[in-house]
């Protein structure tokens, strides 16, 4: 089995400390990461750098490797290698020596199964108005780089231009195949999942596929009826308030709710009767006239009755 020059692979000296080697590893891992580098051998170089870091980052493995490297050209090396504790290893045990250093990576590298990369989830905020039509979005996220021990060593920024389809809902997940972390040993990349978060709207509340909006009206508008301008997600409409409308009454506007592949929801205007400020003497007199004219009306007549 070939004994690679890990120091040369990392571009460092055997006398360099761990901090220097770690800096070199991060630089090379970023340079040869398959999702960043355009070089044809980037994936192979990336794995080679990761293999070197796996050994040189561990004090015991590095010491064993250094001893092996020192005796690599010794004729006795092919027949017998002396471990630091005096134990002898024959040439047929050479693979076992590698296994003790590499955690059996060297022996099993050809036998290890292909492993799929990790999935990544990021939250994407979408405004209600944007749900009506397909739109493009530029998203940025950090792509984790895992070392040989399965720990995140660093994160590489990545940017994608994606399409957000019409009709997305809160909590919906959109899959971008292969945009997660790279697989190992020829395994496929993981996926990127966009988790949709519908941003709160200052006017509209979401109720399933429907929208609700509170429409303030005056007492006389509710009593006599009127037309008021009401906003929707697309444009404003003229809403008819029928005479005798009540506070909390819901007026349906068909087809002005949320859009999905299966259906389009409705908009419900919820009436809120707003009293004017404290009346002056003339206004109070008018209210009194109204009260006298409606003296037989008792709004609490059925109050508390089943």
UniProtKB/Swiss-Prot annotation:
Keywords: Chaperone, Cytoplasm, DNA-binding. GO terms for cellular component: cytoplasm; nucleoid. One of its GO terms (molecular function) is unfolded protein binding. InterPro entries: DNA-bd_curved-DNA, DnaJ_C, DnaJ_domain, DnaJ_domain_CS, HSP40/DnaJ_pept-bd, J_dom_sf. One of its GO terms (biological process) is protein refolding. It holds the Pfam family DnaJ. Residues 5-69 form the J domain. The keyword Phosphoprotein does not apply. Its main location: cytoplasm. It comes from the Bacteria. It is found in: Cytoplasm, Nucleoid. NCBIfam families: PRK10266.1 (NF007618). DNA-binding protein that preferentially recognizes a curved DNA sequence. It is probably a functional analog of DnaJ; displays overlapping activities with DnaJ, but functions under different conditions, probably acting as a molecular chaperone in an adaptive response to environmental stresses other than heat shock. Lacks autonomous chaperone activity; binds native substrates and targets them for recognition by DnaK. Its activity is inhibited by the binding of CbpM. This is Curved DNA-binding protein. It comes from Escherichia coli O1:K1 / APEC.
């Amino acid at each position: 089995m070939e004994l690679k020059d890990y120091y040369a692979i990392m571009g460092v000296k055997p006398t360099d400390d761990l901090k220097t080697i770690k800096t070199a590893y991060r630089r090379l891992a970023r340079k040869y990461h398959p999702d960043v580098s355009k070089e044809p051998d980037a994936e192979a170089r990336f794995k080679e750098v990761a293999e070197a870091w796996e050994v040189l980052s561990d004090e015991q493995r590095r010491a064993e490797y250094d001893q092996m490297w020192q005796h690599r050209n010794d004729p006795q090396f092919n027949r017998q290698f002396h471990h630091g504790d005096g134990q002898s290893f024959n040439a047929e045990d050479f693979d076992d020596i590698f296994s003790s250093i590499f955690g059996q990576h060297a022996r099993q590298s050809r036998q290890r199964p292909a492993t799929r990369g990790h999935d990544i989830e990021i939250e994407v905020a979408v405004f209600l108005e944007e749900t009506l039509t397909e739109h493009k979005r530029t998203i940025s996220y950090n792509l984790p780089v895992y070392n040989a021990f399965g720990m995140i060593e660093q994160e590489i920024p990545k940017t994608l231009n994606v399409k957000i389809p019409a009709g997305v809902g809160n909590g919906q997940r959109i899959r971008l195949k292969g945009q997660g972390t790279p697989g190992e040993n020829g395994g496929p990349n993981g996926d990127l999942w966009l988790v949709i978060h519908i941003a709160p709207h200052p006017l509209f509340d979401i109720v399933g596929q429907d929208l609700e909006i509170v429409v303030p009206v005056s007492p006389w508008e509710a009593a006599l009826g009127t037309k008021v301008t009401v906003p929707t997600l697309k444009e404003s409409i003229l809403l008819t308030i029928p005479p005798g409308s009540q506070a909390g009454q819901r007026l349906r506007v068909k087809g002005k709710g949320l859009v999905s592949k299966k259906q389009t929801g409705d908009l419900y205007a919820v009436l809120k009767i707003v009293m004017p400020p404290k009346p002056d003497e003339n206004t109070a007199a008018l209210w009194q006239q109204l009260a006298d004219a409606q003296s037989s009306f008792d709004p609490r007549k059925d109050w508390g009755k089943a």
